[in-house]
Amino acid sequence: MEKRELYELKDNKIVRKRRFCPRCGPGVFLAEHEDRFSCGRCGYTEFKRKN
């Protein structure tokens, strides 16, 4: 996936579609899986809550 695919334009503002990794910081996005978010760079993982 290219970096430009991770942003969209809304009302003349650039909006991120994905969250940044809290460990790696801005510029490194978390991959969204069915049950978790994960960072491919550092291995950080957050599991989604089941409601």
UniProtKB/Swiss-Prot annotation:
SUPFAM superfamilies: Zn-binding ribosomal proteins. Binds 1 zinc ion per subunit. GO terms for cellular component: ribonucleoprotein complex; ribosome. A zinc finger (C4-type) spans 21-42. Its cofactor is Zn(2+). GO terms for biological process: translation. InterPro entries: Ribosomal_eS31, Ribosomal_eS31_arc, Ribosomal_zn-bd. This is Small ribosomal subunit protein eS31.
